[in-house]
Amino acid sequence: MKKIIICVILLAIMLLAACQVNNVRDTGGGSVSPSSIVTGVSMGSDGVGNP
């Protein structure tokens, strides 16, 4: 049972890492810090809030 839980956690970490790499590629050089997907969304909302 513990092995299954560990495998699920590892898969989740790998998926999150893959998403972060995709975000860096989309920005074209990592101008935006790839700390998490939420930062990109929050930065987008800030740009709309402050014209």
Curated annotation (Swiss-Prot):
Keyword Signal: yes
Domain of life, per lineage: Bacteria
Lipid sites, type S-diacylglycerol cysteine: C19
Disulfide-bonded cysteines: none
Physiological role: Lysis proteins are required for both colicin release and partial cell lysis.
GO cellular component terms attached to this protein's record: cell outer membrane
Membrane topology: Lipid-anchor
Region described as Disordered: 27-51
Biological process annotations from GO: cytolysis
Lipidation (N-palmitoyl cysteine): C19
Compartments (UniProt record): Cell outer membrane
Keywords: Cell outer membrane, Lipoprotein, Membrane, Palmitate, Plasmid, Signal
Signal peptide positions on this chain: 1-18
Keyword Membrane: yes
Pfam families per the UniProt record, alphabetical: Lysis_col (PF02402)
Protein name as it appears in the record: Lysis protein for colicin A
